[in-house]
Curated annotation (Swiss-Prot):
Its main location: cytoplasm. It comes from Ureaplasma urealyticum serovar 10 (strain ATCC 33699 / Western). Keywords: Cytoplasm, GTP-binding, Hydrolase, Metal-binding, Nucleotide-binding, Ribosome biogenesis, RNA-binding, rRNA-binding, Zinc. It is an enzyme of class 3 (hydrolase). PROSITE patterns: ENGC_GTPASE, G_CP. Its EC number is 3.6.1.-. One of its GO terms (cellular component) is cytoplasm. InterPro entries: G_CP_dom, P-loop_NTPase, Ribosome_biogen_GTPase_RsgA, RsgA_GTPase_dom. It comes from the Bacteria. This is Small ribosomal subunit biogenesis GTPase RsgA. Binds 1 zinc ion per subunit. Pfam families: RsgA_GTPase (PF03193). Monomer. Associates with 30S ribosomal subunit, binds 16S rRNA. Its cofactor is Zn(2+).
Amino acid sequence: MRAKITSVIVNNFYVYIYDLKIETKAIPKGIFKHDSHELKPMVGDDIEVELVDGVYLIVKIYDRYNQLIRPKVANVDIVLVVASIVQPDLNTLTLNKYLAFYEARNVKNVAIGLSKYDLASDSLKQKVDQLILDYQRNNYKVFVLTNEHDISLLKKFIKKHTLCLAGNSGVGKSTLINKLDPSIKQRTQEISQFLNRGKHTTTSTKLISFANGFLVDTPGFGNLEVNLTKNEMANAFSDFANYARFCKFSNCLHIDEPHCAIKKAVNDDQIVNWRYDDYLKIMKKLPNDVLEIKTRNQNKK
């Protein structure tokens, strides 16, 4: 039977079995391997279970299409990065760090949720509206979380998917969760009781049934530590991808290299200046890679 691991506490695995629509305990049957390496079951894993003598056994772990470290979870379909317009003030540098980090981790859909728009001044709203247009121009989905129409669109977007909310403390993630599914608070308490969560497990990740899919519940998960290399970051800005392939060097960092297609795109107003400026600020704080300059074959003369 197809199932998904919803929580791991010490060596106890809790799984949701789709056909039976139940959450129950399961134990691994032996050791799993992938590419000759031991594969340990983790939250978010899609698995196969069998009932043997009244005990559910995990007999197979399906291939993961992504894996996050913080929070520790696999197979996330959507990351919604929540940022507030005010209280705290919007910081595009922080927002772009989140976007790049999760795109580098192969999350297919990384979207933006803007909270507290209704508290902004008219002049600030005008700036935010332009910001939204800039992100949308680069194919990001942006939801204004105080707009009921956008909330309706967001509900459709996340339906039947595994959703992870990211963003700093105080930006309104809890408010959004309750708006998307008012019953979530009660069910979260019920699940916590079911799992016997104590103080030593308050930072463990778990999946909660949500919007016909799952919500990644990550207590204690707040600020993001960007642990990408400069090479990884150079490939993490999705709006750079269409231009980066025309850079002279295949491992171009888009900083001061000659014949950089990204810098040309910025000068031609194909990539917005403020996003490129944030990219440069992020790159300055990352450790240097040991680089071998690689020229693209098609550009060699």
